[in-house]
């Protein structure tokens, strides 16, 4: 389905600090003009996937669709950089994403909330393995996971850290989440689970003083956590725009056949 957009949409250009992205931003503003985020019809993010995630975290609540152009090292969430921007915006296909909503409790009693568009990951902070229990919708499913940690990934993020940890690639729009252990020692044969998107996931660190654990929501890290609750956000949703010949759904599908 193509995105309905005015013939000359107002574009706010955002760029990473990398020199190629900054240079491209100046060239695009000279050609198409520039406006504030508040006045824009669409945001154009110039950089790599890391910058796209930062853009979504900073401006996702604006409700403006985001069209990314790859000027970084990794560009799974980006389109290729070309000159015919207006034509491509007219033909762009939307992908609507809901982030994960995370609540973390630390040893000191502090509560920290964050969103994650790719994944939430718990990881041991020292050489010692983490001990983590896993509750789903209030029911304990794993009393004690021993290993490096555990990942909860969205479909859009399932091809990233989750896939590197041998987790499943999830189809876009499948309304599922991937729950994937990182280097599990016990239970040794458990390779994770595919969950309904509305599942509430509670991860408890069983020996936080001797075996400390950190949690990272995309790039936001909180150290020394004792409990983390994760669920799909019911309030926030973002729209990414992709060229129809290489949309996000096709990219996720193609990753399953990459060698």
Swiss-Prot record:
Residues involved in NAD(+) binding: 49-50, 54, 118-119, 148, 156, 159-164, 183
Cofactor: a divalent metal cation
EC number: 2.7.1.23
Gene Ontology biological-process entries: NAD metabolic process; NADP biosynthetic process
Compartments, record wording: Cytoplasm
Catalytic residues as annotated in Swiss-Prot or TrEMBL: 49
Record's keyword annotation contains Cytoplasm: yes
Record-linked InterPro entries: ATP-NAD_kinase_N (IPR017438), ATP-NAD_kinase_PpnK-typ_C (IPR017437), NAD/diacylglycerol_kinase_sf (IPR016064), NADK (IPR002504)
Record flagged with keyword Transcription: no
Gene3D superfamilies: Probable inorganic polyphosphate/atp-NAD kinase, domain 1, Probable inorganic polyphosphate/atp-NAD kinase, domain 2
Reactions that this protein is recorded to catalyse: NAD(+) + ATP = ADP + NADP(+) + H(+)
Gene Ontology molecular function: any one: ATP binding
Keywords noted in UniProt: ATP-binding, Cytoplasm, Kinase, NAD, NADP, Nucleotide-binding, Transferase
Gene Ontology cellular-component annotations: cytoplasm
Family label: Belongs to the NAD kinase family.
Functional note: Involved in the regulation of the intracellular balance of NAD and NADP, and is a key enzyme in the biosynthesis of NADP. Catalyzes specifically the phosphorylation on 2'-hydroxyl of the adenosine moiety of NAD to yield NADP.
The protein's name in its UniProt record: NAD kinase
Organism: Xylella fastidiosa (strain Temecula1 / ATCC 700964)
Gene transcribed to yield this protein: nadK
């Amino acid at each position: 389905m193509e995105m309905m957009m005015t013939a000359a949409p107002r574009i706010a250009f955002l760029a990473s600090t990398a020199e190629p992205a900054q240079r491209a931003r100046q060239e695009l503003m000279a050609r198409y003009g520039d406006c504030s985020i508040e006045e824009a019809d669409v945001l154009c993010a110039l950089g790599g996937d890391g910058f796209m995630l930062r853009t979504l975290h900073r401006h996702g609540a604006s409700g403006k669709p985001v069209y990314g152009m790859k000027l970084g090292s990794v560009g799974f969430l980006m389109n290729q950089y070309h000159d015919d921007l207006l034509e491509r915006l007219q033909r762009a296909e939307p992908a609507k994403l809901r982030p994960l909503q995370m609540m973390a409790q630390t040893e000191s009693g502090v509560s920290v909330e964050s969103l994650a568009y790719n994944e939430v990951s718990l990881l041991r902070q020292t050489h010692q393995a983490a001990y983590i229990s896993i509750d789903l919708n209030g029911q304990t499913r794993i009393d004690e996971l021993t290993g490096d940690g555990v990942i909860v990934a969205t479909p859009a993020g399932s091809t990233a850290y989750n896939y590197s940890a041998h987790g499943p690639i999830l189809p876009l729009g499948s309304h599922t989440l991937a729950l994937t252990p990182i280097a599990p020692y016990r239970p040794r044969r458990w390779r994770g689970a595919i969950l309904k998107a509305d599942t509430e996931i509670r991860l408890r660190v069983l020996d936080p003083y001797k075996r400390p654990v950190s949690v990272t929501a995309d790039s936001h890290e909180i150290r020394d956590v004792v409990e983390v609750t994760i669920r799909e956000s019911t309030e926030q949703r973002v729209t990414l725009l992709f060229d129809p010949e290489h949309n996000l759904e096709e990219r996720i599908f193609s990753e399953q056949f990459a060698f």
